[in-house]
C-alpha cells in the first residue's frame, strides 16, 4: 500500500510538470510538442489553443488544424534544415512555434523572432506565395536582433539608391 501511495503521489506531481514545461521554457501558453528530434536540434511546437502573450498582452495567435500543421512543418523543417545545428546554436535559435493569425496589436505579421527566448513564432497562413521566403526573413531577424553590434545601419543604407526613402509605417 505504501508503494502505491508513493507511486500515486509521484504521478500527481510529475503530470502537471510536463504540461507546464513548455511554458516555463519559452513563456508561450497552450503549446504542444510537434517534433523534438531534428537534425539541427530545433524543437517544434504548435498552438493547441489560441494564445495571447507579451507584456501588454498584445501578441496573439490561433491554433490550426492537423493537416495544416503537417504540411507547413514539412516546408519549415526543409528550409531550416539548410542551417547547421552549430549555426542555429550560435544565433541562439532553439524553438519554432507554429500557429495562425499571428498579430501584434491587431496588425497581422508573418513571424515574431525572440532571440532572448530562443524562439521563432511563424504564422502558417500569413502569405502562401512567399511562405518559404518568410522563414528565412524571420530567421535573419533573429540574427540581427542577437548581433546588432555587428550591423552598421549607415553601411546598409549605402546599398540603397541615393534617392531611396523608406515608407512611413
Which residues are covered by each model-predicted region?
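N-terminal low-complexity, Pro/Thr/Ser-rich intrinsically disordered segments
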Residues: 21-56, 60
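Structural recognition of the beta-strand scaffold that forms the well-ordered cores
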Residues: 119-122, 142-144
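Short alpha-helix carrying the canonical HExxH Zn2+-binding catalytic motif
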Residues: 127-144
Amino acid at each position: 500500500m505504501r508503494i502505491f501511495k508513493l507511486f500515486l503521489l509521484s504521478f500527481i506531481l510529475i503530470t502537471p510538470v510536463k504540461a507546464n514545461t513548455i511554458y516555463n521554457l519559452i513563456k508561450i501558453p497552450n503549446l504542444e510538442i510537434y517534433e523534438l528530434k531534428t537534425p539541427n536540434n530545433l524543437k517544434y511546437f504548435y498552438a493547441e489553443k489560441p494564445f495571447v502573450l507579451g507584456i501588454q498582452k498584445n501578441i496573439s495567435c490561433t491554433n490550426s488544424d492537423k493537416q495544416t500543421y503537417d504540411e507547413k512543418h514539412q516546408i519549415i523543417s526543409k528550409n531550416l534544415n539548410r542551417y547547421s545545428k552549430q549555426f542555429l546554436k550560435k544565433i541562439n535559435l532553439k524553438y519554432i512555434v507554429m500557429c495562425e493569425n499571428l498579430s501584434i496589436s491587431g496588425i497581422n505579421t508573418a513571424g515574431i523572432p525572440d532571440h532572448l527566448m530562443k524562439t521563432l513564432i511563424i504564422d502558417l497562413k500569413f502569405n502562401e506565395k512567399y511562405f518559404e521566403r518568410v522563414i528565412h526573413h524571420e530567421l535573419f531577424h533573429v540574427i540581427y536582433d542577437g548581433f546588432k553590434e555587428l550591423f552598421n545601419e549607415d553601411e546598409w543604407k549605402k546599398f540603397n539608391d541615393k534617392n531611396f526613402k523608406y515608407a512611413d509605417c
